[in-house]
């Protein structure tokens, strides 16, 4: 499932939200913008005749902070780094579930459990152990 830049902002790694563009892609890195980047801005002379390319597209310094963030996130380098961070996060998450699974008694012992089953079984087992300690 693809996320829009607005949805992705909520799920990004916290350290990536305060980085400047040069640290992620460099000043000369090519970036992809959104469709709104292609809309012409008002021309300085206002005569409506075909102006220069600079008059049709906003200068990077004229972009809002949010638009700069969207462009930075569109770089291949940023996407690759984000994918790497996400892969590491998911691997750590799965490893934690595997460790929790090893601590839970099941029959048969090698039965494959889903993550929700592991959590529910852990809740029941902890409740049981609390009850045993209280008696």
Curated annotation (Swiss-Prot):
It comes from the Eukaryota. InterPro entries: bHLH_dom, HLH_DNA-bd_sf, TAL-like. Residues 77-129 form the bHLH domain. It is found in: Nucleus. Residues 10-21 have a biased composition (Basic and acidic residues). SUPFAM superfamilies: HLH, helix-loop-helix DNA-binding domain. The keyword Repeat does not apply. Residues 68-81 have a biased composition (Basic residues). Expressed in developing neurons. Transiently expressed in the cerebellum during postnatal development, exclusively in the premigratory zone of the external granule layer where postmitotic neurons undergo initial stages of neuronal differentiation. Expression is not detected in mature neurons. Expressed in the anterior lobe of the adult pituitary. GO terms for cellular component: chromatin; nucleus. Disruption phenotype: Disruption of the hypothalamic-pituitary axis in both genders, but female pubertal development is influenced by the presence or absence of male mice. Altered female sexual behavior and reproductive longevity, with fewer pregnancies over a shorter period, abnormal estrous cycles and reduced ovulation with aging. Reduction in neuroendocrine gonadotropin releasing hormone-1 (GnRH-1) cell number and altered location of these cells, and morphological and functional abnormalities of the adenohypophysis. Ndn expression almost abolished at the level of the optic chiasma in the hypothalamus. CDD domains: bHLH_TS_HEN1. Keywords: Activator, Developmental protein, Differentiation, DNA-binding, Nucleus, Transcription, Transcription regulation. GO terms for molecular function: DNA-binding transcription activator activity, RNA polymerase II-specific; protein dimerization activity; RNA polymerase II cis-regulatory region sequence-specific DNA binding; RNA polymerase II transcription regulatory region sequence-specific DNA binding; RNA polymerase II-specific DNA-binding transcription factor binding; transcription coactivator binding. One of its GO terms (biological process) is apoptotic process. Residues 1-81 are annotated as: Disordered. Transcription factor which binds the E box motif 5'-CA[TC][AG]TG-3'. Involved in regulating energy expenditure, body mass, voluntary physical activity, mating behavior and reproductive longevity, acting through the hypothalamic-pituitary-gonadal axis. Acts as a transcriptional activator of target genes, including Ndn, Pcsk1, Mc4r. Is also a transcriptional activator of KISS1. May act centrally to regulate function of both white and brown adipose tissue. Homodimer. Interacts and may form heterodimers with STAT3. This is Helix-loop-helix protein 2. It comes from Mus musculus.
């Amino acid at each position: 499932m693809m996320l829009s830049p607005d949805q992705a902002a909520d799920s990004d790694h916290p350290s990536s939200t305060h980085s400047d563009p040069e640290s992620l892609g460099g000043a000369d890195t090519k970036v992809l913008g959104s469709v709104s980047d292609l809309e012409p801005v008002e021309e300085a002379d206002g005569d409506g005749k075909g102006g220069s390319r600079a008059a049709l597209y906003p200068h990077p310094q004229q972009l809002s902070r949010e638009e700069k963030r969207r462009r930075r996130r569109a770089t291949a380098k940023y996407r690759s780094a984000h994918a790497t961070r996400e892969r590491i996060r998911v691997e750590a998450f799965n490893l934690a579930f595997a460790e929790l699974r090893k601590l839970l008694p099941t029959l048969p012992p090698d039965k494959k459990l889903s993550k929700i089953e592991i959590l529910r079984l852990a809740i029941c087992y902890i409740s049981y152990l609390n009850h045993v300690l209280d008696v």
